[in-house]
């Protein structure tokens, strides 16, 4: 009854030293988040307010998108609409081609990962340089992000040091000191900023009232990516729009506290129009399924997500299986839900990667009911034709047993004889539970018989 996730997680757990480090690292981030949350008396009120803002905006998204686009055009920005990933990539390429761009630097954007923009542009002969350090590391390594906020968290400083030596970024063999490696990365990226023809940013928020794009970073790379190049392209999903700066103030107090346990991001950059050094600014608003998801009565609230990553940091399954165990490019609880919205046939294996502990709901800054939604997805697997046939057979059997008192009493009366089954048989492939658990001993008397004796 293994799923694609459980098979990948099994591979991840083969290196127990690394698996323990991965678990402890994310729990430390969760602890920092808790300390920050407990330091604000109004934390729960902020969560409720943030949830209300996102709910209101998404249920009135057509109005706010129109307001945003109108304001952006008044600011002198060219606004584009992309219905899907293919159109988004074509729009980006068209803009770059019109400006004779050969090299583009960009800050971190999960939207461009979603649309497969980098490989598309590279196939057209345009060099794309990731400038977020974590993203740059995995770009050089040819990997995808394993976390939406800390994309290279699965690599340690020795991995990065060896990579930098291989790519010629580091010139001191064996020096894997993080401070030194960061310094060498800065030197390497500095030339890219100065020689790029275009800069691209994502956007944490789009302000409908003013047409502004707001980007939060800890490295200042969004500012650097838009300071020297003469062209700035900003790309955001439709759900990133919020009404005004009063609403932004709520999210700015929560985003970094929830995601990394910091009071705020080091840099919060506001882009209303092309910077003095740039000649042109374009904003691309991307649908790629979002307008359809809004109509999903049970799961549309996943669009409230502000991509802080806190649900991953706390999730016991993500912490112990890693980001690459999931089939969707966003892992963890939010990735399970978004992946199912995207393609339930392709990503249904991820819904098993949840204990339903609901810790994700406890920490989510916008009060997303992630665990409840995952439970609902599980109930729908048969409708999608992806329910596990073995589980279906077992459930039918259990339904028969629990639906008949005589069958139930007969079964519980025989249960203790399972204690005498030889261990190799009990732990064989027919019993997947035994792969990760020690089988319990069955009592001689079932609970309902013990209760009867006690009540005499």
Positions of the model-derived regions?
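Short Cys/His-rich zinc-binding micro-motifs
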Residues: 305
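The feature marks the mature, well-folded catalytic cores of soluble enzymes
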Residues: 1-298
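Intrinsic disorder at enzyme termini
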Residues: 1-25, 29, 39, 394-456
